[in-house]
Swiss-Prot record:
It catalyses: reduced [plastocyanin] + hnu + oxidized [2Fe-2S]-[ferredoxin] = oxidized [plastocyanin] + reduced [2Fe-2S]-[ferredoxin]. P700 is a chlorophyll a/chlorophyll a' dimer, A0 is one or more chlorophyll a, A1 is one or both phylloquinones and FX is a shared 4Fe-4S iron-sulfur center. The keyword Iron applies. Phylloquinone binds at residue 692. This is Photosystem I P700 chlorophyll a apoprotein A1. GO terms for cellular component: chloroplast thylakoid membrane; photosystem I. It comes from Agrostis stolonifera.
């Protein structure tokens, strides 16, 4: 008989077949709620259906069930993303001029959409060069594809099919992990394991495999492309991977294989893992060898980070211990209790993630132009403007979302009885001081930033240019920004002795990179005009934060409504008979925050668009003379409100306004239509519910008279529904108007 030690018990972390798969639910709209499942009595039903369909908290109070629904929905989201990506790649394969663009990216514009002639729409197919007629695209996919080493439309086609397969796989996973093997709550709360897997797996191995792809596939293919080799002559990706001699012809150290790695002679690899800084003068993008080096380094960091947290082996960090040790002399209990909050409230978790991701997205927007990562991206001005604008809007929305979910956490998940003297409790206890100080800052910034402009407008109108704030009269130079620029410009050889050039040409240093006679990037001068508009940025950002933070800190209670938590996340007023208590819910703060976010981002993208056209983008003559698109007018024109209206909005709108009859005419129609959508929003925002209810009742009377009254009783939108429809159209109209204005302008002149 053999005596064995008892086997360690394996934790079962899934439930088998918890929810029956049935399509019957699909036929019962509102099946998740007892009230909605009864069907519509009034037209309010359809609005409530939309409002609550994804509010899993309202379907059940069981955290495990909520977690499973969210987890499953994430797979659905990934499936849609793969489907969308597949569509992008399919368009590149089937309807684009990618191969032609690859052969001459400086003279041929990217296009992946050809409009069918039905009743004259083929006018939209403009000549993008090389004899191809289509819509010029500004998504940056062509540049991304070239950087990743795609040389033919067949490769794009195969990738599109691959993405479709992945979309199907994700759809299956979403079904499987809800209906067949659903994780237990403990699995969702195992944060150390999650951190290890996400850091080492997603970020670590993800970066490592991308670095591997770049070294073995992208670098050699881009070497050939830069040297002018016909894409059809270049070996296929798998040939580089399977045949080391091919790579060794381009990078001799490949002949030695992994020997330098194991003998610690790493400098051998310096020919394809570089640390150059600056831009490649051939393509105007970052050096791809720098990018490969970066991803390898990032991979190492994340692989190490993914082994830091304590799971089955009893070594490493525990998140709870880290958080509870995190307290200083002035912070009471510090982060004690935060672990419990973040493992039981997904709103709190989501709020943090949205805030981080939103900030990161805005950082990405700025890096995309200052350090353009892909070949021929920097000289494609339409794409540069689109990428910046897109990432700024997305970042703004994510940050407002962070405040929204923080407020939902406060209302639904925060338990004041168990929290005492931790950081969150301390912030809530001195919220009046925080909000009143922030309010003072907003008033100060608003009056002073606008005051500088109004002063300039007045002096300009009185014909007293010598009394204006400008680079040629009373200077307000942004000395701190210039100091930061200078530090970075002089870093190579000083604080960064290994680098040959500074991280970005925008810092200064005098050099300019031009590709095919177009400026890719040059040092960006900052002056009084930038100082003024930066204070407008500070103002709009602080007001957005004031509104959102007030919504979070006063989500549960306020002096006006001490029992606000009982009223929920969104409510119109504190009941009848209490005047002056409308628009105080956390939801209303998010609503107002969205408008200020829109203000803030609009000023940023206007600043960027004009500054780049004035001081960066343009052409360069054989003698080295740079001619900018708007001839450097930013410094003198943007220092008055009138200048912004006349020389930016009005002057640059001429392309979109005069686009009729040209291939840009769709932008003219969008410009008009989006203005209409925006104006339509005002009808919802500036009108009371009672007005519409009265109108509806007289229309219902007429229907009754004619015996055609519907069974479902018509109702005016509730106050909150009306505001939701209003803000949606306001933002949609505003963003689409800006999009049409920017693109018609930059495609025409860029």
């Amino acid at each position: 008989m053999i005596i064995r030690s008892p086997e360690p018990e394996v934790k079962i972390v899934v439930d088998r077949d918890p929810v029956k798969t049935s399509f019957e639910e699909w036929a019962r709209p509102g099946h998740f709620s007892r009230t909605l499942a009864k069907g519509p009595d009034t037209t309010t039903w359809i609005w409530n259906l939309h409002a609550d369909a994804h509010d899993f908290d309202s379907h059940t109070g069981d955290l495990e069930e909520i977690s499973r629904k969210v987890f499953s929905a994430h797979f659905g989201q990934l499936s849609i993303i793969f489907l969308w990506l597949s569509g992008m790649y399919f368009h590149g394969a089937r309807f684009s001029n990618y191969e032609a663009w690859l052969s001459d990216p400086t003279h041929i514009g990217p296009s992946a959409q050809v409009v069918w002639p039905i009743v004259g729409q083929e006018i939209l197919n403009g000549d993008v060069g090389g004899g191809f007629r289509g819509i010029q695209i500004t998504s940056g996919f062509f540049q991304l594809w070239r950087a990743s080493g795609i040389t033919s439309e067949l490769q794009l086609y195969c990738t599109a099919i691959g993405a479709l397969i992945f979309a199907a796989l994700m759809l299956f996973a979403g079904w499987f992990h809800y209906h067949k093997a659903a994780p237990k709550l403990a699995w969702f709360q195992d944060v150390e394991s999650m951190l290890n897997h996400h850091l080492a797996g997603l970020l670590g191995l993800g970066s490592l495999s991308w670095a591997g792809h770049q070294i073995h596939v992208s670098l050699p293919i881009n070497q050939f492309l830069d040297a002018g080799v016909d894409p059809k002559e270049i070996p296929l990706p798998h040939e580089f991977i399977l045949n080391r001699d091919l790579l060794a012809q381009l990078y001799p150290s490949f002949a030695e294989g992994a020997t330098p790695f194991f003998t610690l002679n790493w400098s051998k690899y310096a020919e394809f893992l570089t640390f150059r800084g600056g831009l490649d003068p051939v393509t105007g993008g970052l050096w791809l060898t720098d990018i490969a080096h970066h991803h390898l380094a990032i991979a190492i960091l994340f692989l190490i980070a993914g082994h830091m947290y304590r799971t089955n082996w009893g070594i490493g960090h525990g998140l709870k211990d880290i958080l509870e040790a995190h307290k200083g002399p002035f912070t009471g209990q510090g982060h004690k209790g935060l672990y419990e909050i973040l493992t039981t409230s997904w709103h709190a978790q989501l709020s943090l993630n949205l805030a981080m991701l939103g900030s990161t997205t805005i950082v990405v927007a700025h890096h995309m132009y200052a350090m353009p990562p892909y070949p021929y991206l920097a000289t494609d001005y339409g794409t540069q403007l689109s990428l910046f604008t897109h990432h700024m809007w997305i970042g703004g929305f994510l940050i407002v979302g962070a405040a929204a979910h923080a407020a939902i956490f406060m209302v639904r998940d925060y338990d004041p009885t168990t929290r005492y003297n931790d950081l969150l409790d301390r912030v809530l206890r001195h919220r009046d001081a925080i909000i009143s100080h922030l309010n003072w800052v907003c008033i100060f910034l608003g009056f002073h930033s606008f005051g500088l402009y109004i002063h300039n407008d007045t002096m300009s109108a009185l014909g007293r240019p010598q009394d204006m704030f400008s680079d040629t009269a009373i200077q307000l130079q942004p000395i701190f920004a210039q100091w930061v620029q200078n530090i970075h410009a002089t870093a190579p050889g000083v604080t960064a002795p290994g680098a040959t050039t500074s991280t970005s040409l925008t810092w200064g240093g005098g050099e300019l990179v031009a590709v095919g006679g177009k400026v890719a990037l040059l040092p960006i001068p900052l002056g009084t005009a930038d100082f003024l508009v930066h204070h407008i940025h500070a103002f709009t950002i602080h007001v957005t934060v004031l509104i959102l933070l007030k919504g979070v800190l006063f989500a549960r209670s306020s002096r006006l409504i001490p029992d606000k938590a009982n009223l929920g996340f969104r409510f119109p007023c504190d009941g009848p008979g209490r005047g002056g208590t409308c628009q105080v819910s956390a939801w209303d703060h998010v609503f107002l925050g969205l408008f200020w976010m829109y203000n803030a981002i609009s000023v940023v993208i206007f600043h960027f668009s004009w500054k780049m056209q004035s001081d960066v983008w343009g052409t360069i003559s054989d003698q080295g003379v740079v001619t900018h698109i708007t001839g450097g007018n930013f410094a003198q024109s943007s220092i008055t409100i009138n200048g912004w209206l006349r020389d930016f909005l009005w002057a640059q709108a001429s392309q979109v306004i005069q686009s009729y009859g040209s291939s840009l005419s769709a932008y003219g129609l969008f410009f008009l239509g989006a203005h209409f959508v925006w104006a339509f929003s005002l009808m919802f925002l500036f009108s009371g519910r009672g007005y519409w209810q009265e109108l509806i009742e007289s229309i219902v009377w007429a229907h009754n008279k004619l015996k055609v009254a519907p069974a479902t009783q018509p109702r005016a939108l509730s106050i909150i529904q009306g505001r939701a429809v209003g803000v949606t159209h306001y933002l949609l109209g505003g963003i689409a108007t800006t999009w049409a204005f920017f693109l018609a302008r930059i495609i025409a002149v860029g």
